[in-house]
Amino acid sequence: MSQNRKDDHIKYALEQRPGYNSFDEMELVHRSLPKYDLAEIDLSTHFAGRDWEFPFYINAMTGGSQKGSQINEKLAQVAESCGLLFVTGSYSAALKNPSDTSYQVATGRPNLLLATNIGLDKPYQAAQQAVADLQPLFLQIHVNLMQELLMPEGEREFRSWRQHLTDYSQRLDLPLILKEVGFGMDRSTVEEARSLGIQTFDISGRGGTSFAYIENQRGGNRDYLNDWGQSTLQSLLALQPMRDEVELLASGGVRHPLDMIKALVLGAKAVGLSRAMLDLVKNYSVEEVIDIVEGWKSDLRLIMCALSCRNLQELKNVPYLLYGRLKEAQEQIK
């Protein structure tokens, strides 16, 4: 992927105006008599083979350009200081250009919790190289079919994707996460990928950055596809029957701690933030972003206390109300 395309993605992601967000159509039921003290609230979670202190992380965004390198450097500083997981953008650019150091953010940061990302169009050998280069805690594998179809330079051959997923699962010795890129993930996809050996899924729904919008801004002429896909909460609702069978992660349109809590109520093990973090490092100093993220941790505890939930397991039993398009979609889920 060219540096220009990487920078285009950053540019148009920041320019995109927010549209429909399904998080606004879910309401949590307040509890007036609390069970716990604020100090008792436990934010820890578990997915991809290990425990995590907090149920949110910095999701895959960028790399492969000077601008991407600067953003990754800031995000890595925030992640290490706050004890957050940081997932780099797709490592494909570094595979094409071995001199690219925009992903080498762990250098000099022994406490950084780092994972990386690669597209499912890449064969096992490419994934193996990414793992060897970065030694990530897990490998996030993105599926971006609509984005590829809308890119003039995008992939046009997809039959190999299932075989690649099988190869990754059978031959890579680290946890794998299958990730959408803002179009949502349906139950049949999760069931099939699970049969191929995948246990953890970032369902990344519509509501945040739209790569359909971005590719159309880059010169496409299919604006009518800008809102393609299902929202994050639509995807989580559709996957309720599987939430105890697989590990679900949620991203796409997550703006603040209340959105995070709503996703956790619907069974997500953790919540990924991309656009929200991109906005922060663009508009604030690293020190200010660290303060904001630390505030998010406090806010998560505050909201959980208001819901009389001591931990994430108890959050799954919180009653909620749905409205509008989200309620209509939920009623049609089979």
Swiss-Prot record:
Gene Ontology biological process terms, A to Z: isoprenoid biosynthetic process
Molecular function terms from GO: FMN binding; isopentenyl-diphosphate delta-isomerase activity; magnesium ion binding; NADPH binding; oxidoreductase activity
Keyword rRNA-binding: no
SUPFAM superfamilies: FMN-linked oxidoreductases (SSF51395)
Binding site for Mg(2+): E148
Residues binding substrate, per UniProt: R5, K6, Q147
EC number assigned by the record: 5.3.3.2
Keywords for the protein's UniProt record, in alphabetical order: Cytoplasm, Flavoprotein, FMN, Isomerase, Isoprene biosynthesis, Magnesium, Metal-binding, NADP
Any one Gene Ontology cellular component term annotated for this protein: cytoplasm
Keyword Disulfide bond: no
Chain sites annotated for binding FMN: A60, M61, T62, S90, N117, K179, S204, T209, G253, V254, R255, S274, R275
Family assignment from sequence similarity: Belongs to the IPP isomerase type 2 family.
Function text: Involved in the biosynthesis of isoprenoids. Catalyzes the 1,3-allylic rearrangement of the homoallylic substrate isopentenyl (IPP) to its allylic isomer, dimethylallyl diphosphate (DMAPP).
The protein's name: Isopentenyl-diphosphate delta-isomerase
Gene: fni
